[in-house]
Amino acid sequence: MSVIVPPALVPVSPTTRVISCAADEIGEVAAAIVATVPSDGVLGVATGSSPLALYAALIRRRAEGLRTEGLRLLALDEYVGLAASDPRSYAAYVRSVIAEPLGIPAHNVRVPSGSTAADGAAYERAIAEAGGVDVQIVGIGRNGHIGFNEPGSDAETRTRVVELDESTRRANAEHFGGDLSLVPTHAMTQGVATILSARRIVLVAAGSTKAAALRAALTGPVTADNPASFLQRHPDVTVVADPDALREDR
């Protein structure tokens, strides 16, 4: 695995490390970091396509002896209005893609749910009661969102219901048969401040469609216009991305 960081993409923050590797290496490289979580630690999990290779690598490591059954999982977000049993829900994703293959029992898995401020506050309490997150996995949206913190989300936000940007809904329509009308308009998401409270953050990104947002997050000003830019304020961030996501000319 080679580490090649284009000069223009040297992050502003001295506490952010960027690892550039081939797209098919991202999962293994990120999993090596995530595997440092204690066997009974707390892992913050993202959903979607970006971290799939990471989870597959963790599953392989479990087959080779990594102890994962004692991990506690805390998910970043969930659509409002989808039952946990709905295969399109993030509760179903976390269960089928992460928890069950890693042997993690249901009582050690929490996914945001509900649609009220009280529900958001309850999830914040659950994070605190777990002792906080050891490693938080995140992706980055084309508009710079992390979790479902869309542009305009400030650094003080906590778990809450948000309205999804149309660009986000369009990007996720593939999981709803390509029908935008079926994609929920709102979600419950951990806030920026919630994400930043994790002890370590690992961001995974692949493909040129993420390049502009990632470049702005790493080298641009810290601004609510690109919520991922708030990661510059965190003391321990590792970005694992392929050369396309780190291109300077996008």
Locate the predicted segments by residue.
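A glycine- and small-aliphatic-rich helix-loop capping segment at beta-alpha/alpha-beta transitions
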Residues: 57-67, 151-160, 220
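ATP/nucleoside-binding phosphotransfer catalytic cores, i.e., glycine-rich phosphate-binding loops
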Residues: 6, 193, 197-250
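Ligand-binding beta-strand-loop-alpha-helix segment within the catalytic cores
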Residues: 2-14, 66-137
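Glycine-rich N-terminal segment of FAD-binding domains in flavoprotein oxidoreductases
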Residues: 39-64
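Glycine-rich beta-strand-to-loop/alpha-helix junction loops that act as flexible
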Residues: 45-50, 138-142, 206
